[in-house]
Amino acid sequence: MTKTSSIRWAVGSLLAVALLSVLAPQQGRGQDAAKPKLYNTAKQKLLEGKQIFSFTQSKMDINGYCESAKHYDFTWFEMQHSTLEFKDIEAMIAACPHVAAIPMIRLPDAQEWHIQHATDIGVLGVIVPTVDDVDRAREGAKWSRYPPVARRSSGQGQARSIWGINGIDYAKTINDNMLVVIMIETPTGVANAFDIASVPGVDVVIIGNNDLAQFSGYAQTDDRYQQMVTKIHDDTLRAGKIFGQANWTYATGHPLSKDAKFFQNGPSNDGWKPPAPAGRVP
């Protein structure tokens, strides 16, 4: 290679490096822009380290639901302790499908058909009560997402038409947007908390505060109760999952409040308060 050729080669190499340094950031920005943002806004807030609160819907009331859902992060549809049916929840979600609060259901059980019905009607979160062991946690996770990560089957419910809009491919995005919440409510669950929280597909572990007090026999003010709360907290964070408590009064003023992110009920996002039940003074 002549001296002139060597100079040309060196200059060409420098130009190529300079060009790549200019293009690379542009390509990175393009890839970031192409990555879809979660339409599960409640989950997005959790991933950003924020607390989320809900309104509990325990009866069929389309107008009431559509009003309350304007003001909260998510709606906690209560099926464990109510007579609500899936068709009721389906109708409420359909009436105002893109209201602010993300629909989630506390299931009566973690059987396949419960979770399949819930996901097909359009919820973006399932809450599994009274999880004592890994097997029940696995059931909750297994039926909530599509293969290859889980075993949800492909149904024909309204979920696709609700969330598969504006160019969004529901089947390709729902796994990331789904939220699987596990409730620990017994001393047995406390003992197994780390293994439960470590189950793949479990996103959030919350304490069922009232039932934990009932099943343990310790008042929530008892140090032994608080030790159980601390163990669940520590095990959940050690497993890399999000921690929460059903009792929203633990959102502030408690030693673990800074780490507690997911709550049943609590303050609305804009100061709105639900109307008092008939016959009860607000």
Feature locations, PLM:
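Bacterial N-terminal signal peptides that target proteins for export
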Residues: 1-14
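Bacterial N-terminal signal peptides
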Residues: 12-22
